Amino acid sequence: MMRTVATTVFVESAADPRLADYRALTDVELRRRAEPAEGIFIAEGELVLRRALKAGYPARSALTSERWLPPIAVLLANADVPLFVGSEELLEQITGFHVHRGALAAMARLPLPAASELLPSSGRVVVLENVNSHTNVGAIFRCAAGLGMDAVLLSPSCADPLYRRSVRVSMGEVFAIPYARFGAWPAGLHELTDAGFRVLALTPDATATPLDALKIADDDKLALLLGAEGSGLSGLVLAAAQPVRIPMSGGVDSLNVAAAAAVACYALRRPG
């Protein structure tokens, strides 16, 4: 018989060893952890948790306050994991911040595919080089998922898409689109060209081809390269790709990388 609510465990001490996954979750502390090696990430809020579970990520446990207990208990009814419940003050003491989105859940990571596994079935991919802002990574994943991209590929130094802030900014869309991390960069560019992709490098350079003037064949496979805020794409990457730009006006030369990703993904979407 399926359960209708999760098994709840009331906690009263921030030192409870069962809560180790939730201690010191501020962004500064998270950056000090080898979180990918530990094999977990934190899903924050009912919506993000729901999307993570739907995508097949297994929950290890969850932490919530009594105010949010009813919906979270129903959501985790069949997860067979403890749902820890404490006061809002205790949750803040444990995590280091005010938990205002209802709940946190410690989730097990899934094995990442190799880029070469994603490319054959993809027609549109976003490639990020050295984008180390979790906020920008999360926003770009949301753009990519919502604007018809098939996958996101990351250079080795890009921020982790499953960090708490990335997941939150993406509204859980990091779970909706496949992604992979190149083992070597910029050598990974060869994987794109070998798979038949036309590689486009987004740049504010005035000599680049405007996106609205770009000629795209119906059967073109496109890889959109985006660089970090400020520094942009490296010279090696720009030299190996076709430079494209967003036409700008009003004396503004460029957009934030997440905003630029949204414009470019829309411009490069499949016809129809």
Write out the residue ranges for each language-model feature.
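Boundary-proximal intrinsically disordered activation/regulatory segments immediately upstream
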Residues: M1-P70, C158-A159
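RNA substrate-binding interface of SAM-dependent RNA methyltransferases
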Residues: A6, L110-T207
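Short acidic-hydrophobic, aromatic-tinged amphipathic segments that line or gate anion-handling sites
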Residues: T8-A15, P82-S87, P178-A187
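Glycine- and other small-residue-rich loops at beta-strand/loop junctions that grip anionic moieties
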Residues: V11, F41, E129-N130, S155-P156, ...
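Short, aromatic/basic amphipathic alpha-helical patches
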Residues: P70-D80, L236-V237
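Glycine/small-residue-rich loop that forms an oxyanion/phosphate-binding "nest" at active or ligand-binding sites
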Residues: L76-A103
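Structured adenosyl-cofactor binding patch, chiefly the S-adenosyl-L-methionine
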Residues: A103-A106, C143-L147, P161-V174, G235-G272
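Active-site/ligand-binding-proximal alpha/beta "capping" segment
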Residues: L200-V252
